[in-house]
Amino acid sequence: MIAKLTGILDDTGPDWAVIDVNGVGYLVHCSAKTLTHLGLRGDKVVVHTEMQVSETDQRLIGFTSAGERAWFRLLTAVQGVGSKVALAILSALSVEELQRACAHGDSAMVARANGVGPKLASRIVNELKDKAGGLAGYASPVGPGGEAFVAPPGNASADAVSALQNLGFKPAVASSAVAAAVKELGEDAGLNDLVRVALKRAAG
């Protein structure tokens, strides 16, 4: 099972990207939002992946964050939602918007996605409403260079994200600012330094 790819963005298409990992090109199918976040050819990227295998096909699906992948898994567990429809939904809505739509029963928002009619949108919202709260903490921030950033719990990065949120910054803004601070200061930076630099990034 391939769970994550770290490499160079080699090529992109309407709904796919090729990630070069040590000379091996992996074809990854992605949502429009993921493709936008990946950046330009030659950029270093980190892509979370889900492998789908059927009798006639096997493919890698790519995501900017573990949260987006978690929602993809939930969506494809709903009857009538395959990988194509799930990616269409994730192209139309951010992880935060999808979580909010399911939590509030807003099927009209889900129906904005291509290929999703009112009946299917209602089924998705009804089946995932109770599960939406469990994924409320997931965001899809993207750090410098198009790399998704998820702060591991219990370390200085996670504490810095929490500190910025306590100061009133939105989760995605806080996470992106801390990602930039980590890139500038290094992964061993202390909490105070991370918060100081992240505050400048978030405010600027």
Swiss-Prot record:
Keywords: Cytoplasm, DNA damage, DNA recombination, DNA repair, DNA-binding. Disulfide bonds: none annotated. The keyword Transmembrane helix does not apply. Residues 65-143 are annotated as: Domain II. Residues 144-154 are annotated as: Flexible linker. Gene3D superfamilies: 5' to 3' exonuclease, C-terminal subdomain, DNA helicase RuvA subunit, C-terminal domain, Nucleic acid-binding proteins. The keyword Cytoplasm applies. One of its GO terms (molecular function) is four-way junction DNA binding. One of its GO terms (cellular component) is Holliday junction resolvase complex. It comes from the Bacteria. The RuvA-RuvB-RuvC complex processes Holliday junction (HJ) DNA during genetic recombination and DNA repair, while the RuvA-RuvB complex plays an important role in the rescue of blocked DNA replication forks via replication fork reversal (RFR). RuvA specifically binds to HJ cruciform DNA, conferring on it an open structure. The RuvB hexamer acts as an ATP-dependent pump, pulling dsDNA into and through the RuvAB complex. HJ branch migration allows RuvC to scan DNA until it finds its consensus sequence, where it cleaves and resolves the cruciform DNA. Has three domains with a flexible linker between the domains II and III and assumes an 'L' shape. Domain III is highly mobile and contacts RuvB. Homotetramer. Forms an RuvA(8)-RuvB(12)-Holliday junction (HJ) complex. HJ DNA is sandwiched between 2 RuvA tetramers; dsDNA enters through RuvA and exits via RuvB. An RuvB hexamer assembles on each DNA strand where it exits the tetramer. Each RuvB hexamer is contacted by two RuvA subunits (via domain III) on 2 adjacent RuvB subunits; this complex drives branch migration. In the full resolvosome a probable DNA-RuvA(4)-RuvB(12)-RuvC(2) complex forms which resolves the HJ. Belongs to the RuvA family. This is Holliday junction branch migration complex subunit RuvA. It comes from Novosphingobium aromaticivorans (strain ATCC 700278 / DSM 12444 / CCUG 56034 / CIP 105152 / NBRC 16084 / F199).
